[in-house]
């Protein structure tokens, strides 16, 4: 009997899912609107989603990563770095691979209002001589790389490489609701070839399965979670449908088609899409998005946002993404975002062709509808209707 109990406890320990709660906060865009600064920001920082997905070879010798693409991100979690742990609010971003946070060596105004890592307060920190540069708009964040223990939920990820900022020019990061970014994409797109956090977790035997999953709640504040090392079926209904990853860099898959009202509106001969928790909206080729905006009656307001009549929301059709033969409808109530007294279109245009054609980004608007499993062991995504 004792042996059976021990075997049961062992099996339970091997199936532990490490959950990190995510909190939904006001996005950087909302903060800028409230401060009356969005127009000025957009004049000098033109958001260009395509730059986030350019190959590493397209950049200079110093690794770069764009920041203005996090303008609409709303979901954030807390991690600890160092011994004892210093806490940071980060974006868990499946569209990038590096971890970085502000440091005490940064004298920029943006750093002064965010948590800053102090290496001298950590007994486990190890410095390196490698530099890191993260571009945004007309300036760039510069810093260096170091190693330390990173606590994610109840996982202690030792000897993890991460970036520490020393300079954050420009004013817009001052209003950012996050301190840094924790990338969850493949190591092949990591700046400076730094080992991503999840890879280090797996290499150190800290998770029982080589996968993580994400549930984004539609609730205004709570309920969202990222889970490492397992799948919790209470977060979805029906069964998971598995989709092969087509490029092991981003979490990239093949779309069969995109339709509205039964008509193909884009991706007629299949196309590529990236499932990205670090992008809030649904993004695609500018011409296709322009047609969709016209179809749903969206028009640009003085802040540069595409506005839709709130009264028309429930009469508009679903947009349907067919993936690996399965249809994934996204209703208008999901792709139109209600903000105060306005209704904002959840579509954004960008132009970035892949070797197989046009590229789409399935951001939080999509992920709120579909619980997503990021399976590194089998290089596949699992999708099921969110509970």
Swiss-Prot record:
Disulfide bonds join 106-111, 267-271, 310-343. Its EC number is 3.4.23.1. Coiled coil: none annotated. InterPro entries: Aspartic_peptidase_A1, Aspartic_peptidase_AS, Aspartic_peptidase_N, Pepsin_A, PEPTIDASE_A1, Peptidase_aspartic_dom_sf. It catalyses: Preferential cleavage: hydrophobic, preferably aromatic, residues in P1 and P1' positions. Cleaves 1-Phe-|-Val-2, 4-Gln-|-His-5, 13-Glu-|-Ala-14, 14-Ala-|-Leu-15, 15-Leu-|-Tyr-16, 16-Tyr-|-Leu-17, 23-Gly-|-Phe-24, 24-Phe-|-Phe-25 and 25-Phe-|-Tyr-26 bonds in the B chain of insulin. GO terms for biological process: digestion; proteolysis. Its main location: secreted. Residues 1-15 form the signal peptide. SUPFAM superfamilies: Acid proteases. Residues 16-59 form a propeptide. The active site is at residues 93, 276. PROSITE patterns: ASP_PROTEASE, PEPTIDASE_A1. GO terms for cellular component: extracellular region. Pfam families: A1_Propeptide (PF07966), Asp (PF00026). Belongs to the peptidase A1 family. This is Pepsin-3.
């Amino acid at each position: 009997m004792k042996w059976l109990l021990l075997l049961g406890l062992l099996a339970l320990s091997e199936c532990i899912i490490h959950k990190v709660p995510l909190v939904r906060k006001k996005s950087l865009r909302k903060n800028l609107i409230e401060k009356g600064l969005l127009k000025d920001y957009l004049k000098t920082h033109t958001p260009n989603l395509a730059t986030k997905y350019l190959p590493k070879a397209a950049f200079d010798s110093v690794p770069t990563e764009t920041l203005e693409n996090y303008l609409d991100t709303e979901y954030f979690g807390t991690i600890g770095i160092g011994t004892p742990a210093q806490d940071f609010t980060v974006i868990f971003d499946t569209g990038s691979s590096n971890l970085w946070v502000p440091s005490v060596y940064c004298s920029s105004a943006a750093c002064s209002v965010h948590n800053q890592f102090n290496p001298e307060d950590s007994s486990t920190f190890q410095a390196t001589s490698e530099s890191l540069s993260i571009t945004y708009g007309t300036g760039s964040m510069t810093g260096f790389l170091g190693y330390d223990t990173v606590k994610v939920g109840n996982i202690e990820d030792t000897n993890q490489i991460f970036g520490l900022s020393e300079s954050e020019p420009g004013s817009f990061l001052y209003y950012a609701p996050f301190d840094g970014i924790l990338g969850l994409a493949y190591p092949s797109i990591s700046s400076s070839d730094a080992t991503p956090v999840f890879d280090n977790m797996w290499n150190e035997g800290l998770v029982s399965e080589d996968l993580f999953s994400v549930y984004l709640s539609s609730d205004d504040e709570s309920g969202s979670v990222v889970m490492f090392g397992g799948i919790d079926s209470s977060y979805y209904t029906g069964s998971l449908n598995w989709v092969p990853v087509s490029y092991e860099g981003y979490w990239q898959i093949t779309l069969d088609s995109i339709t509205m009202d039964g008509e193909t509106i884009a991706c007629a001969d299949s196309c590529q899409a990236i499932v990205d928790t670090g992008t809030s909206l649904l993004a695609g080729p500018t011409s296709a998005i322009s047609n969709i905006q016209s179809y749903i009656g969206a028009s640009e307001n003085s802040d540069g946002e595409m506005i839709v009549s709130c009264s028309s929301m429930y009469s508009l059709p679903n947009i349907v993404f067919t993936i690996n033969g399965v249809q994934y409808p996204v209703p208008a109530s999901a792709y139109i975002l209600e903000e105060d007294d306005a209704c904002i279109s959840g579509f954004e245009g960008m132009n970035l062709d892949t070797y197989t054609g046009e590229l789409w980004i399935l951001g939080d608007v999509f992920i709120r509808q579909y619980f997503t499993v990021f399976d590194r062991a089998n290089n596949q995504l699992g999708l099921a209707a969110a509970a």
